Every structure is written in structure tokens, then in C-alpha cells.
């Protein structure tokens, strides 16, 4: 609907430094929709200067964006685990109420009242970028995430090294 997601706490800021990457979701957010439903955002980013397109962090590695997001798509208990873990780290606000409602809706299997967006970010050296191929399975096998939605973004800055790009990315999200 064009509205931005609310991300009450960026997981990345509590567990990572730009020079020491962690594993798993980097951000968890939500958006209230005009029809009264809530959309959950499960977001993860990976960095690659690998010359192949797509780089293995997209869909080949064991912990690739594709494989880790498929785990959340295929296993609601993992989504619930992340949501409840996340709720322990934020103070009681409107955000807590919205995310708590998501927990209840998922547990009650009221799928018409919530949606999931799988957010994927690829931080890429501009010399390696191929905007047609870097999406990998997220383009060729997008139907595997239905009824969810995939948002895939590539972050690349001309004239910036991968280290400079990563530093810019982390300064923005932390």
C-alpha cells in the first residue's frame, strides 16, 4: 500500500558490528494495512563481492538469503520464536501491541488477517553487479514464497569499494 514498515528495534544494532557479521534476521518490522490486517517484515541482508551472478550468498550457501527465508516461510514456529524473542527486547508501546497481535494471529492461523513479507538485501560491489542475474532463485522461484511476498533490494554504490559500501550500509541501519 506504499506505507513504510515500522522497525521498532534493528536486530543488527544489538548483535553486530560492520566488521563482524552475525547470522539470521537483521530486522523485524510490521505495517498496519488499510483493511485492518498486519504485514510482518522479516528482513535479512548479505554482503558479497563474489564475481559470480548471483553470488552464493543469494541462494547457494547453506545460510543464503533464499534458504534462510525459506525456513521462515516453511516453519511458522520459527517465525513465532523470532517474534516472541524480539518482543522481549522492546518496551511496551503500540509496536508491542501490533507485534503481540501478530503472534496471536499466527498461533490462531488467521491467515486472512496477517501477511508476511520476506525482505532481502544484497550489498554488492558495483564491479560485480548484474541487476538481471543477482536475484537468483528469488526471481526464478518466487512462487515458493506464496502467499507471502518477497522484496529484494540490491545496494551498490558506484566508485565505492565493498568495504566503503558496507560501512555506509551499517551507518544507515545502526
Where in the sequence are the language-model features?
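Short, solvent-exposed loop/turn segments at the edges of secondary structure
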Residues: 22-24
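A short acidic/basic microdomain associated with nuclease active sites
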Residues: 2-20
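Charge-rich, low-complexity intrinsically disordered segments
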Residues: 137-174
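Short, catalytically relevant binding-site loops at active-site mouths
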Residues: 14, 47-50
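Short secondary-structure capping micro-motifs at structural edges
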Residues: 13-16, 28-31, 103-107
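Conserved catalytic cores of phosphodiester-cleaving nucleases, focusing on short active-site segments
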Residues: 27-29, 40-47
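Short, solvent-exposed loop/turn segments that connect beta-strands within catalytic domains
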Residues: 33-38
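Acidic, metal/cofactor-coordinating or nucleic-acid-engaging core segments within structured domains
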Residues: 51-130
Amino acid at each position: 500500500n506504499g506505507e513504510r514498515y515500522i522497525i521498532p528495534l534493528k536486530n543488527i544494532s544489538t548483535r553486530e558490528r560492520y566488521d563482524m557479521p552475525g547470522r539470521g534476521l537483521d530486522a523485524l518490522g510490521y505495517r498496519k494495512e488499510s483493511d485492518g490486517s498486519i504485514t510482518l517484515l522479516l528482513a535479512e541482508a548479505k554482503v558479497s563481492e563474489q564475481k559470480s551472478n548471483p553470488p552464493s550468498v543469494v541462494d547457494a550457501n547453506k545460510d543464503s538469503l533464499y534458504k534462510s527465508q525459506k525456513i521462515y516461510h516453511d516453519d511458522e514456529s520459527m517465525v513465532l520464536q523470532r517474534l516472541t524473542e524480539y518482543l522481549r527486547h522492546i518496551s511496551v508501546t503500540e509496536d508491542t501491541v501490533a507485534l503481540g497481535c501478530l503472534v496471536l494471529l499466527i498461533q490462531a492461523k488467521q491467515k486472512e488477517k496477517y501477511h508476511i513479507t520476506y525482505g532481502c538485501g544484497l550489498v554488492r560491489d558495483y564491479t560485480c553487479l548484474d541487476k538481471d542475474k543477482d536475484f537468483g532463485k528469488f526471481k526464478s522461484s518466487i512462487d515458493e514464497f506464496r502467499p507471502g511476498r518477497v522484496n529484494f533490494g540490491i545496494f551498490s554504490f558506484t566508485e565505492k569499494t565493498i568495504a566503503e559500501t558496507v560501512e555506509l550500509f551499517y551507518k544507515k541501519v545502526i
